[in-house]
From Swiss-Prot:
Molecular function in Gene Ontology: chromatin binding; DNA (cytosine-5-)-methyltransferase activity; DNA binding
Enzyme Commission number(s) from the entry: 2.1.1.37
Catalytic activity: a 2'-deoxycytidine in DNA + S-adenosyl-L-methionine = a 5-methyl-2'-deoxycytidine in DNA + S-adenosyl-L-homocysteine + H(+)
Pfam families, alphabetized: BAH, DNA_methylase, DNMT1-RFD
Active site location: 1183
Compartments in which it is found: Nucleus
Keyword annotations of the record: Chromatin regulator, DNA-binding, Isopeptide bond, Methyltransferase, Nucleus, Repeat, S-adenosyl-L-methionine, Transferase, Ubl conjugation
UniProt protein name: DNA (cytosine-5)-methyltransferase 4
Gene this chain is encoded by: MET4
Amino acid sequence: MEMETKAGKQKKRSVDSDDDVSKERRPKRAAACTNFKEKSLRISDKSETVEAKKEQILAEEIVAIQLTSSLESNDDPRPNRRLTDFVLHDSEGVPQPVEMLELGDIFIEGVVLPLGDEKKEEKGVRFQSFGRVENWNISGYEDGSPVIWISTALADYDCRKPSKKYKKLYDYFFEKACACVEVFKSLSKNPDTSLDELLAAVSRSMSGSKIFSSGGAIQEFVISQGEFIYNQLAGLDETAKNHETCFVENRVLVSLRDHESNKIHKALSNVALRIDESKVVTSDHLVDGAEDEDVKYAKLIQEEEYRKSMERSRNKRSSTTSGGSSRFYIKISEDEIADDYPLPSYYKNTKEETDELVLFEAGYEVDTRDLPCRTLHNWTLYNSDSRMISLEVLPMRPCAEIDVTVFGSGVVAEDDGSGFCLDDSESSTSTQSNDHDGMNIFLSQIKEWMIEFGAEMIFVTLRTDMAWYRLGKPSKQYAPWFGTVMKTVRVGISIFNMLMRESRVAKLSYANVIKRLCGLEENDKAYISSKLLDVERYVVVHGQIILQLFEEYPDKDIKRCPFVTSLASKMQDIHHTKWIIKKKKKILQKGKNLNPRAGIAPVVSRMKAMQATTTRLVNRIWGEFYSIYSPEVPSEAINAENVEEEELEEVEEEDENEEDDPEENELEAVEIQNSPTPKKIKGISEDMEIKWDGEILGKTSAGEPLYGRAFVGGDVVVVGSAVILEVDDQDDTQLICFVEFMFESSNHSKMLHGKLLQRGSETVLGMAANERELFLTNECLTVQLKDIKGTVSLEIRSRLWGHQYRKENIDVDKLDRARAEERKTNGLPTDYYCKSLYSPERGGFFSLPRNDMGLGSGFCSSCKIRENEEERSKTKLNDSKTGFLSNGIEYHNGDFVYVLPNYITKDGLKKGSRRTTLKCGRNVGLKAFVVCQLLDVIVLEESRKASKASFQVKLTRFYRPEDISEEKAYASDIQELYYSQDTYILPPEAIQGKCEVRKKSDMPLCREYPILDHIFFCEVFYDSSTGYLKQFPANMKLKFSTIKDETLLREKKGKGVETGTSSGMLMKPDEVPKEKPLATLDIFAGCGGLSHGLENAGVSTTKWAIEYEEPAGHAFKQNHPEATVFVDNCNVILRAIMEKCGDVDDCVSTVEAAELAAKLDENQKSTLPLPGQVDFINGGPPCQGFSGMNRFSHGSWSKVQCEMILAFLSFADYFRPKYFLLENVKKFVTYNKGRTFQLTMASLLEMGYQVRFGILEAGTYGVSQPRKRVIIWAASPEEVLPEWPEPMHVFDNPGSKISLPRGLRYDAGCNTKFGAPFRSITVRDTIGDLPPVENGESKINKEYGTTPASWFQKKIRGNMSVLTDHICKGLNELNLIRCKKIPKRPGADWRDLPDENVTLSNGLVEKLRPLALSKTAKNHNEWKGLYGRLDWQGNLPISITDPQPMGKVGMCFHPEQDRIITVRECARSQGFPDSYEFSGTTKHKHRQIGNAVPPPLAFALGRKLKEALYLKSSLQHQS
């Protein structure tokens, strides 16, 4: 007769029966009509809302029941429905509590739905009013969750969700029902329990309710509802069976009903309720008086008053936070905590320190959330007298009028995410003096601090007005002071663990916690004392730290547990000083540091975050921008297009699990989406004289006469000039058009054909562009001369190129800017200039096609490009019908081609199961292109649809090793194919390009990694019907690709020398440029990943490198012994170079940089690179902001000056190399609202470079990890800009598009999710041959033990016989246990840990499953991947500088071994060969690898640079 409410399962309520009664029980109510038959009726959209009329209530309810009928309920004798968004109200429409049904008529307003599963999307019917409600019932006793039913004469309704306006009234009744269910559960288990035990059990069960402020409030509520609960449970006896509990005579239930301290009586004992003018009922009458209607009404009124009093009490209590009111913070008394700290001592430091304000320029109002974050090592805190002081006396919230002044000193470094291990005995009180790379500084006043803790880490952070500082280990001198803080933190975490082990946190009272703390073992880090009073004193006086830990925890049950509320209350009772908590998050950074150390003259450190050394050109461009767009300028005005993308990427941090872009799920990669519609030109209405000036110059291809000059009104328009056009759109500015030619049409209209000139603000440059510079585009248009609004002054600018012309060009440009400023001051029209072509579809700015511009001959290069593209996009048969042309590629019978894998649907194509839900498993199941041979072109009958191809292609298929099995794929060459006799007839659009299939003996002798050519070999036959590989049958002959390269044939015969680049380029090997490799300067070189790849491509030789970190610089030198490596600040090196060349006047640098440059020894100065010696500059300037660790305060110029990007660009400006390459993280594009990205390109364009930008995915070039990199190429106007390398491997990692103005998006590399020439490289391919090592392995050199198995292993191992750097970080005891418990299967992570405790060697008992992760998983994507194992068939995670199971990546456990991945395994994931050496500690080596550019990506870029050099050389030969 009742309804179950278990997850995903519901049982309908039907007429009374013995069977149903046995399953569900509830009080029996008045019988209702049971002879109603259901009828299915389809709900239409128009019927979703039906408005009931009072005179048709019964009829309309019948319609509702019919409309919401389901097939499952057709046979039920009495309808059951679901009710949501409902209100119970009287005849006047006033909402009424459920209990009012006993006094008057109640009606229903809400949405009626079928009773089925809530997860199903079903249409409901809304009614304004129906009923009357006959009775209500409560069920769900056996399930432990109340279900409230209301019944009319026709049906029963399960009340699911009240409307918002009815929620408060209904929630109170629902809590009454919950109390009934909880009492039922408790008495069913133990009918003989005492009343106190019953109240305690119910209080624990209902502790999660939001309407009760404490466990005591729950008990009072249950007592107040004693009579209600008794009546409900007594009603169950009518349907109870003999063996079930009898409630009507249960002594505990009777005692609850009769309890004297009924809350209603106690709260309202003196309240008189006026029922009408003639009768007053007091609270005494409510108990002893007759149960007439007035008394019932009075009871309900009193209960409503009690409900409101509960709500007022709850609101009052909820305003109290840890330690008191949310408005106040209780100050800790230094006297009370003094006994827990050492005797007074003073801070002494012989090292000279630098003022914090030197690093972070003050004077700006900033949001505390925007402050930079750093790490502070070897630190000490002290007051204004230099006496050491506890961090505890500072507030943990931002407070006003703090009367405690705390300063600090330490070694500042970049935030490395370090913290304190809970089980590390030396973490907080280490007496070892560790030397840290960084600068000794003294801090300004510390304003607040906070504690964060995870599974086994503690993070303590403090804030000044300048920055946030995550605390590393304190100094030896200060360690005892910090030891007390850490001990208190451990006490708090111990209490937290105690509570979490309880089934209900409310079970553990404050007194119980204190007792348990007394019982801790002395070797427990949370041990205080065995004496109860001592423990309680310690907990109370240090209570703010403990309360802060609980306050920051996301679980509401923890925040308001009895222990927390009691501790907060005891702290309030101490009556300490209260500080007002500030709500304002913005602070004003003051310019004076009151730290006592400020009186000691600071020494400038070599490790200081030095202001960038720049050329005057770079300084001017960036400085002028920030002087115009000051902090007051809203960011939307800078680059609105990038704001949304930046907000998304702020939290992304190279997340390889980002959602697929719907546009990236298309089979064909498209570079430009959402192309804007052509603008409509607004005609000029006024009459004006238009006439040609001069003779006819020729004719167009259509025979129309051409002219070179025309008079349009008062303006003279000539070919090669620029005109203004009005756009028929109020939101658009005027168009400027470059005149290509003018002609008179056949209808005698005077016409102009030209190309649009775009303002810089309309390009990717945004507001970083020069307002006078226009960019030619390939958008052309034809308009009538009468539509011209006017002309503009336009200079097609050209400057001599080279470092030797810098000064001359600077002087010319300076005069030009002065003239332009004078014209602007005098109100004269702007003089524009143009020196570049902007092509958003190619992602770059290119040299102007000067030879094709303004010829006046009727030729337009843009029209020609468009015609070629249209022709290229066509698919058509050749004349002989034995081949066809598609996407510009000619195909003939016998050609080997790529076919999209989704067109091959036979069982022969093994379909791997996608693991997109697993971290690092997105590539599993993705397929490379299917290689086929074109056998024939089948011409079809003429298609009626012109868009359909009139032919199909017949193909024979080659199988790949991965089509056979994973084992076969692992052990086989990635370029190997198996011939088959399987044939397919497919449409031509299935074909994606051509490749070569050769005999294995005809393969290039030196096959490179990574692969950049399209060559395969085949030597066996695959029988798909049997699944066996065989030798070619004698009667089967395969026609292989012919080798047209005679040089390769000679090399195969031993008569030539292998060039190393013969197989992977578009050029022929004997046509490789004979010029020497480019002399290269690598800045921010790291360990040399970028240089290694470029050198292997044969395009560059790194002669000089600059690296800031000594271990990385040493590694670079080991691997590039011929290079001159400067381990120094690049600002100092640039200053020294400009001094050496006598260009100090053009150098903007600090005194510090000048002094350090002067200190360089003569040997260093003699080896400095000079302008004219450097052909190529490359590097990846570090900026912590690009990766989310530091953000400028509204882009203030003072802080921008410290960015290394300025120095990097200044190297390019001063040296003017032929080529320049910038590499950085993906977020570089959107960082700082895109301004840094835009200003970088604007600076290069100002220098005269051509510029190309894009985002590439390293995984598509042969590494087993997702690693997107922003690439900016710059080439001198005399060179050819390199094209983007073609992605060669399948890889599913979307998000490589760059947003451009006008709704455009540029994608440099096509998405290979749907196919590529080769499969993705797996974890097993990468590290499967490496020998097993134990946790914490530290032996540098060892034997391989096995031969390489996979193609990748053979390439990456090379000729190495000794394995180096197969070492790993050690896991602590708890994490090692967790690692061993993580199942060795794909996707396993912390969620697979058993929910149990483990005892550590020190006797501590810890949760195996990290509690912090369990409680917050729902809000953090389940913390997917933390403590995760790698998948042999998946990819490795993003290579980071410090792999750890709780880090940003988290998935760092070996697939089969219980350890973190090693240094060598990380290096392989980046594509470093085993011969590559790293330097320093294990942490240094991980950092070098994590910061490096993957060499395969650099190799691919280098090969495209080599092609560009070849193209220039060939063009020069042609001319």
